[in-house]
């Protein structure tokens, strides 16, 4: 469809960093998200967006965006290999050192 119309446009913003957003168009595009204030001064968001693929099926991506970055989830997205066990141990040690105030330059 070359011309889409907005069929739903709902927005709630409490003015304190909390918000809700819901948007839908006549050609199958949907976007919903919820936002809350983050611990680092950022906005934390979680939501879902959907759109129609050329074969008529719906693509869906769920996501979280916060102080740890943007983390989308969808069966359409490629997934990398699992980290080896020793990397998980190194990350745990680094987190302990960070909590103790140890830094490396």
Curated annotation (Swiss-Prot):
<feature type="region of interest" description="Disordered">
    <location>
        <begin position="25"/>
        <end position="46"/>
    </location>
</feature>
<dbReference type="InterPro" id="IPR000618">
    <property type="entry name" value="Insect_cuticle"/>
</dbReference>
<dbReference type="InterPro" id="IPR031311">
    <property type="entry name" value="CHIT_BIND_RR_consensus"/>
</dbReference>
<dbReference type="GO" id="GO:0062129">
    <property type="term" value="C:chitin-based extracellular matrix"/>
</dbReference>
<dbReference type="Pfam" id="PF00379">
    <property type="entry name" value="Chitin_bind_4"/>
</dbReference>
<dbReference type="GO" id="GO:0008010">
    <property type="term" value="F:structural constituent of chitin-based larval cuticle"/>
</dbReference>
<feature type="domain" description="Chitin-binding type R&amp;R">
    <location>
        <begin position="16"/>
        <end position="81"/>
    </location>
</feature>
<dbReference type="InterPro" id="IPR050468">
    <property type="entry name" value="Cuticle_Struct_Prot"/>
</dbReference>
<keyword id="KW-0193">Cuticle</keyword>
<protein>
    <recommendedName>
        <fullName>Cuticle protein AM1159</fullName>
    </recommendedName>
</protein>
